[in-house]
């Protein structure tokens, strides 16, 4: 458990998200402002299951998993903002996705996600993934809030 009021450790993340190994892609939330933004990270290790086939001898963390990590951070922000754990956040669309640099074992993938707008259960976000302060992925995406 993390003591800072605007941080969440893995225990709190597990209480909010339905994802579990090997698909939980957040290690810690470092800051959030309800209804506005969230920052989080995932440590990328050689033990990630995706590296078995992506790519043997040259492991690169898949771009689609970076997008999923951004969406999971957005989901935490949504759950914390809306306060309803009976809902599920589902991807509804991805726009303007760009992959700028590869992410490899040993990197810390930092995520910065900002809420653009929310209307009728559709949340639109802008997310940036970075490593060592350098953007590796950027996208706008939408999540739909639905009952389980």
From Swiss-Prot:
The record's annotation in SUPFAM superfamilies points to:
Thioesterase/thiol ester dehydrase-isomerase
* Similarity-based family: Belongs to the thioester dehydratase family. FabZ subfamily.
Its GO CC terms are: cytoplasm; membrane
Full protein name: 3-hydroxyacyl-[acyl-carrier-protein] dehydratase FabZ
- Pfam families the record matches: FabA
Q: Which UniProt keywords apply?
A: Cytoplasm, Lipid A biosynthesis, Lipid biosynthesis, Lipid metabolism, Lyase
Q: Which GO terms describe its molecular function?
A: (3R)-hydroxyacyl-[acyl-carrier-protein] dehydratase activity
Disulphide connectivity of cysteines: none
Q: What is the lineage of its organism?
A: Bacteria, Pseudomonadati, Pseudomonadota, Gammaproteobacteria, Alteromonadales
Provide the function of this protein: Involved in unsaturated fatty acids biosynthesis. Catalyzes the dehydration of short chain beta-hydroxyacyl-ACPs and long chain saturated and unsaturated beta-hydroxyacyl-ACPs.
* Swiss-Prot/TrEMBL GO biological process terms: fatty acid biosynthetic process; lipid A biosynthetic process
Where mainly located? Answer: cytoplasm
Where is the catalytic site? 54
Read off the HAMAP family from this record: FabZ (MF_00406)
Q: Where in the cell is it found?
A: Cytoplasm
Q: Which reaction does it catalyse?
A: a (3R)-hydroxyacyl-[ACP] = a (2E)-enoyl-[ACP] + H2O
Q: Give the EC number.
A: 4.2.1.59
Q: What InterPro entries has UniProt attached to this entry?
A: FabA_FabZ, FabZ, HotDog_dom_sf
Instruction: Say yes or no: keyword Repressor present.
Output: no
Top class in the EC scheme: lyase
